[in-house]
Amino acid sequence: MDLFDFFRDWDLEQQCHYEQDRSALKKREWERRNQEVQQEEDLFSSGFDLFGEPYKTNKGDALANRVQNTLGNYDEMKDLLTNHSNQNHLVGIPKNSVPQNPNNKNEPSFFPEQKNRIIPPHQDNTHPSAPMPPPSVVILNSTLIHSNRKSKPEWSRDSHNPSTVLASQASGQPNKMQTLTQDQSQARLEDFFVYPAEQPQIGEVEESNPSAKEDSNPKSSGEDAFKEIFQSNSPEESEFAVQAPGSPLVASSLLAPSSGLSVQNFPPGLYCKTSMGQQKPTAYVRPMDGQDQAPDISPTLKPSIEFENSFGNLSFGTLLDGKPSAASSKTKLPKFTILQTSEVSLPSDPSCVEEILRESQHLTPGFTLQKWNDPTTRASTKMLEDDLKLSSDEDDLEPVKTLTTQCTATELYQAVEKAKPRNNPVNPPLATPQPPPAVQASGGSGSSSESESSSESDSDTESSTTDSESNEAPRVATPEPEPPSTNKWQLDKWLNKVTSQNKSFICGQNETPMETISLPPPIIQPMEVQMKVKTNASQVPAEPKERPLLSLIREKARPRPTQKIPETKALKHKLSTTSETVSQRTIGKKQPKKVEKNTSIDEFTWPKPNITSSTPKEKESVELHDPPRGRNKATAHKPAPRKEPRPNIPLAPEKKKYRGPGKIVPKSREFIETDSSTSDSNTDQEETLQIKVLPPCIISGGNTAKSKEICGASLTLSTLMNSSGSNNNLSISNEEPTFSPIPVMQTEMLSPLRDHENLKNLWVKIDLDLLSRVPGHNSLHAAPAKPDHKETATKPKRQTAVTAVEKPAPKGKRKHKPTEVAEKIPEKKQRLEEATTICLLPPCISPAPPHKPPNTRENNSSRRANRRKEEKLFPPPLSPLPEDPPRRRNVSGNNGPFGQDKNIAMTGQITSTKPKRNEGKFCATFKGISVNEGDTPKKASSATMTITNTAVATATVTATAIVTTTVTATATATATTTTTTTTISTITSTITTGLMDSSHLEMTSWAALPLLSSSSTNVRRPKLTFDDSVHNADYYMQEAKKLKHKADALFEKFGKAVNYADAALSFTECGNAMERDPLEAKSPYTMYSETVELLRYAMRLKNFASPLASDGDKKLAVLCYRCLSLLYLRMFKLKKDHAMKYSRSLMEYFKQNASKVAQIPSPWVGNGKNTPSPVSLNNVSPINAMGNCNNGPVTIPQRIHHMAASHVNITSNVLRGYEHWDMADKLTRENKEFFGDLDTLMGPLTQHSSMTNLVRYVRQGLCWLRIDAHLL
């Protein structure tokens, strides 16, 4: 106790010494603070919100809550810190507790030692006697902490005053407490002054020499105020003060303990208060952000940031400079955080700041200059390249002492100066507005730079700026964070993430300067930035699109080889790529490249999905599921090529130029991708070409962004331009395996260049040829088949839909084709190339009137064929129909021959577009189909061959092989048609069976389609062409949803019911696909069950049983009943095994209980009225008995009950199936002709028919119903 009192008194005396030395200055400072900060202090004491309104407005309360949770409630801290009595209590130096405090202080002192290296030696020697000096140390720490700093003078004095019981000092400190802001600035000075005084006290008792030695470095690092203190005080004292601000040594010494505690050499109470102070400083990080956002609202906080920069120096500055860097520094040394916070409070005493600034300038003029210049320089140096190079330097600098760091910082500063002239005009202005976001992103550095820029004009700001600069110099020397930054580190890390994300989204182009400013201390920041880059690399992906641009720009600006030059380059890049998000820069130069590559990969991948489907998610859309995947794979493989192409800087500029027109697009690109994959794919392909040829003008916004990403990410323009072949090869090789059958698909899925080329091919080869053929054969003689004409129009639409569905990318192509086709059809009518037609033939077979030969000879042959048809009921030739995936199932509404002509032309065109892909399928499908009747046992393939030879120009050759021979004038074709006419009905049914993939139903105009029934009556109805291609369940699900939504939008009940029935067919296909794929998550039974409900609902829309029901209603009811019957039967088959098991179990159970049941009156008969016999009660299993004995003598186990219920449900499906089938048979009798034709065309439907046959049969019937009801 005596020693403690002695030292405390001695500390007070030391305070008196320093006060005498500094009394005039302190008084001036206090007076100025009282005048300037009184209002701010009142606000603070009255509950001033640490998180300035602007900050909260921008970030919302969630961030404040999170900060409070992480760092503690500032309001609580504020009370403790701002309340003098609380401070005394926290300090725990009351006279009564003084003896205890020394002991407790030893522990806190360790933490302060961590913060302030000087303290540890002091504490080591004088922990018992150091209680007062530790408070002084605590004061420094608290001074470093804004709130701590405010209360710190009080604490120092309080710690001394309690020990010395000096009322004058105690009263003086409360006064200081009253002027918190003033006290803060003074407190800082006092911390420098009083603290040295206290330190000498501690130093005497404690070993201050080692700490003084350590402090010498921080002093040189630019803490002028401390330097003065050092000069006036023992080096030990000065060391303590300087190191607290953040000398590298102090940081290292504090590093280990800092994580443990923010405690500074405080008594136990003080220790707690220190922790609170740390929390408060942490909270100050946010006020700093608030200041940057609204300096007017929280001017004190803003200067405090400056002080933080000066005191917290490296740690706080780095944290502020870039929260990314803060994150890295945090990981490295969280200790500096508290120092930074404490510095925040001092900004309001300009004189102290100026003095410190002058001292710091003397100590480290280079750093001061750098810091002054840093606002702009930082903006320029913020470049990731600088950060990267600096990061390596900083890694060295962290362990290195201030001088070394200063040198490095000076060099960096010089580099920044070089780049600065360019960026300064742009970045500085941006820097000022940007600091708020910068503060968020980069913490104090942004605010410090901003304050520095503003501090020149404002004395308060100046002090803070000077401090920040001074701190900045040491900060550069020691990028390590303050030890108390453990909490703050979390906050900063979180803020960094938030700010980086916000910047990436909010600050497109402006963020670059902002980020530059926010990262103004790139010298120190590099390590932190690198750390943050690593941590934020995951965040960066959100901005991958822009990164490729950044990387390209950087490459372009990289002509300078030196790392310092990269800063200038970075500045240039920033200027040129202001649109790039801050996060891109934040990533850091090192990471950015990798990240950019990854990003480019991702971006490149995005364009693919977009091309593949309307939405990136849909890129695996039914038709192109495999192709998009292949393409994605290609993109995944492409990263390496991208890495290589990046070296091509000159090309990157070209990309940049191209991007320039589309820069706006990056944002819209996502929307564009989502909006339409077709447009994206087209644009991407076009973009590629445009990039090569017309990059600035043609590139579409969204597409441009994609192309940029594709080019930048996967390849630089040079690689795309120079190695476009290789790039195409890569994409082609990747895509070809997937799309090899269809170059068109490949082009769409492949890189833009390849896509563009494919587009050319599609336009020239496919469109022209197809158009010429289709009109030539189909359009001329559409008239012969009246119903056929109507259906012809409908058929092309469906076919187009089918093909489009299969090829999401062709959608865009289709968009272009329709107009071109209309224009080209007349032009190309007469051009018929047999080989081309054969190649172009799509899988879909659409019967076209055989009367449309473009040539006179063809016309004659068609006439002959027509005559023959009329005489022999020859079927019309089949022709490929246009692919329109969205409409593939909808029959075109054109009922007139003109519709047929157009449709035929369109069919030719569209077919040509998709033929490559479909050719193989079509041929295979057709070959797979065999004609079973009479002369038609020969397979479609053989017929196809014959027709191909005979019909030179018909695009329908392969599909029409059996039927279209009539079109050809050759006798062979005639013979073929003759043989096939007798079996037209069977052929058509077999063809549809083989070719129709119930998902693809397209109507073809059957000109004079003779459906040969047993009576050989002429049945002329359009027949849908079905594609045999297999799709996954998702594809059918999407189709079903489209139809269902279409039905939902209709008001006419019959049309609604028809569409619901059609949707039910798609759902049925989906269930069938689920059966094929055992990996499907959903049970096909469930799908069928839901389909049944939809059909039942559709049937309720129209009361077919009503006497007012029309034939159409009854026909629809028949089709629905057929579907229901087969669905029920199918559901039973799916559950048949379960039903068998249940049946066996139930039979066994009943056998076992037969005797018991005989003895007991049946509960069904007695209804539970009979009193159970004791025997029956005994027979009941107490465990299994689920029934109530009062209700009957027999109880059924729950297990048996469930089995019986399930068995009934399963077997009831069979009953329902037969019931509905019988109902359909009854209704069919009223429309024998309609269903006779349908059976003739599609083949009779039985209860054993497959789901595919059912779907095709019913869909064909629905098509006819639509035609009859004029719904097409």
Curated annotation (Swiss-Prot):
Phosphothreonine sites (modified residues): T478
Compositional bias ranges of the Polar residues kind: 97-107, 161-183, 576-586
Swiss-Prot/TrEMBL keywords: mRNA processing, mRNA splicing, Nucleus, Phosphoprotein, RNA-binding
Source organism superkingdom: Eukaryota
Phosphoserine PTM positions: S391
Biased composition (Basic and acidic residues): 151-160, 212-223, 543-558, 616-629, 818-829
Chain intervals for the UniProt region annotation (Disordered): 93-183, 200-223, 418-491, 535-687, 779-829, 842-903
Organism encoding this protein: Pongo pygmaeus (Bornean orangutan)
GO CC, one annotated term: nuclear speck
Stated name of the protein: AF4/FMR2 family member 2
Bias (Basic residues): 630-640
Known function: RNA-binding protein. Might be involved in alternative splicing regulation through an interaction with G-quartet RNA structure.
Molecular function terms, GO-annotated: G-quadruplex RNA binding
GO biological process: mRNA processing; regulation of RNA splicing; RNA splicing
Cellular localization per UniProt: Nucleus speckle
